[in-house]
């Protein structure tokens, strides 16, 4: 072919591609500008976390109007929301799926469900980038460090305070774990995903799905927000520097959009550095939206462990010299999500949930220790550690897409556990749950119980309950505690999802969020861990859609 012919052919191909896009766009159902804006907000609030801002999918399915992919064997498959059509999409949105997507017929109106079914047949908009200068422009230092109190000015047992996300209210409740009374409710940005504690235990860092991060100082007579900064338009994770000599010096935050991680001052949140995560996946394909999922601070090196969802890469970020930043990139599996430390706190265990695997990172050697096959769509939260009577130290994860909890044997340098070495990095037992849809598992070093929720299960009774296993006899079926009934709240149309068991500092209470509809009364239900009897129900009107709960001591020390 002549050199003249090549650009003509390229232009023809580009033109045909644009024509195909135009045809696909023309085939999308009509929407008004107002409907598009309303749908965009609903998508951000309810869908982007699993399906991605660009709708390319991760934990959830690809929701582009049209997509195609070529398998390893060369086979090409195509699909898209346009192929599914409005009616089928309405049914999926309304009634959920067996893969862990909840039903939205008790959350959205019929009109909103129809609107969303039409919206996802349109080509997604690309949000703006967010630069270091944008971060600096958003930074608000409310109380400089030198003007903060120099000692604790209240009598609260700070290590037993719970930071509770009030999801739809855009607020954070600080609850006294000793008295079970709300200490303070603060503005926090939309749908706080996690709260993390400073190494000192003085500060609570929150980060929400609108990209806003705050520092809350617990030392004044009443807790107060002392600084805020925006990392981007959507984020999930932050953590401070914890290594000796660097305690609370820096804070890292990772965003879903733009796909990047940023480093700020740990006490003021002044922006310092932004690093993009765009690049190649473990399969060698370029991805435009590799979102930053979980981030943790290493206990044995001055590093953060940064998990990049779409690329399947784990990045160890050395924070000793930010001007000459050193990172180690470890290949694992797609799509990385959440995770936690093993029993020894040497290995970080992270779910690659769309690959049905758990990756174990050795933070001492800076290498991948293992990739462990699990059941469908592992979702550990931070997981849970205990010493199994038959297999020694294990780390555990539940699953969104399967009705089991997987127990994975983990290594230990303690001589008393040497006899279990042959089991390391294997799923040694699966605990049977009444259904799929688990989000969080939890135990405590002082407890004999292992707790698991199932809030994403489509069955009301399953989703409204938690399940408690006896770790001394794991052959027994779990005890079901119907949290919704125990709360004493009136029946509601919306499923009141029992979510995220969280222990108090002493390990003798377990707090469960009862997450109802925005207009329904929600609650935090507290059980005695030893007897499994109801101990207290917090039903203050301020408790609106509670989800994540983070005990200060347990979060500081990675107790789970």
Curated annotation (Swiss-Prot):
Binds 1 heme c group covalently per subunit. GO terms for molecular function: electron transfer activity; heme binding; hydroxylamine reductase activity; metal ion binding; nitrite reductase (NO-forming) activity. InterPro entries: Cyt_c-like_dom, Cyt_c-like_dom_sf, Cyt_cd1_C_sf, Haem_d1_sf. Residues 127-560 are annotated as: D1-heme domain. Its cofactor is heme c; heme. It is an enzyme of class 1 (oxidoreductase). Coiled coil: none annotated. Residues 63-78 have a biased composition (Basic and acidic residues). Residues 27-29 are annotated as: N-terminal tail. It is found in: Periplasm. Its EC number is 1.7.2.1, 1.7.99.1. Keywords: Electron transport, Heme, Iron, Metal-binding, Oxidoreductase, Periplasm, Signal, Transport. Residues 61-80 are annotated as: Disordered. Induction: By anaerobic conditions. Induced by nitrite, repressed by nitrate, and inhibited by oxygen. Heme c binds at residues 47, 50-51, 97, 101. It catalyses: nitric oxide + Fe(III)-[cytochrome c] + H2O = Fe(II)-[cytochrome c] + nitrite + 2 H(+); A + NH4(+) + H2O = hydroxylamine + AH2 + H(+). One of its GO terms (cellular component) is periplasmic space. Gene3D superfamilies: C-terminal (heme d1) domain of cytochrome cd1-nitrite reductase, Cytochrome c-like domain. It holds the Pfam family Cytochrome_CBB3. Heme d1 binds at residues 193, 236-237, 256, 382, 500. This is Nitrite reductase. It comes from Stutzerimonas stutzeri.
